[in-house]
């Protein structure tokens, strides 16, 4: 069994939980996921099965799209709704929506983030959330991410001394939307957190086409495997090249080939089938992963 599954992950489930359950449903151990989702986040979790597990790193590289809500007025230990309140800054008057949108725009493009303490990023061999649960604060490494698009998608509404609005973000891998929400609050002068989040797109897969675990289990029981997408969709943003029969033969034997390309990595096709991932070495391309 080989292919890519567009899984709709439910709230309360870790990405590891999803993989574990799918191994039981599909009866195979060779399964991986293409980008971790926090337990409280719902939405698209790309799953690689069989040969497709060799595509995971490329599936993770493609941009992701999220929709969620930001609340101004208080911040939490986890930067989302699951944590304890750590700071409060009441919103006592209406916000200027133009100024809010300008602050949002200032957080697009390449930005620097500091991962939240409640995250799986490792420092000195331990995950940050392990330090956090032990009540320890440690220095966290900065990381560079790219925010391709960040926009407010609703009017600002008010609930007592809180302000809230929904948003949409397209970003690179490694981006913490929780942290982006907190950083926006800081720019506006308020403590803030992310109240909920949905991933609507990842690895070229869309939420409207995603299937829940129960739906996949029903299809397997009925002998239907149409939920398995071909490996080709896992190439993500890699530039695609179509090889001649002679070039394809060389690639199958693991030999270098010459191509008029400049990209570091290429997805090489023979007809409409993915043959290999090629890696640039000097003026030539070397097969990095061969699939057939």
UniProtKB/Swiss-Prot annotation:
Enzyme Commission code: 5.4.99.25
Active-site residues, record numbering mapped to chain = 38
Q: GO:BP terms for this protein? A: mRNA pseudouridine synthesis; tRNA modification; tRNA pseudouridine synthesis
Enzymatic class:
isomerase
Listed under catalytic activity are: uridine(55) in tRNA = pseudouridine(55) in tRNA
Cross-referenced InterPro entries: PsdUridine_synth_cat_dom_sf, PsdUridine_synth_N, tRNA_psdUridine_synth_TruB, TruB_C
Gene Ontology MF terms in the entry: pseudouridine synthase activity; RNA binding; tRNA pseudouridine(55) synthase activity
Q: Keywords of this protein's UniProt record, alphabetized?
A: Isomerase, tRNA processing
Do you know which HAMAP family this protein is assigned to? TruB_bact
Function comment: Responsible for synthesis of pseudouridine from uracil-55 in the psi GC loop of transfer RNAs.
Q: Which family does it belong to?
A: Belongs to the pseudouridine synthase TruB family. Type 1 subfamily.
* Name of the protein in question: tRNA pseudouridine synthase B
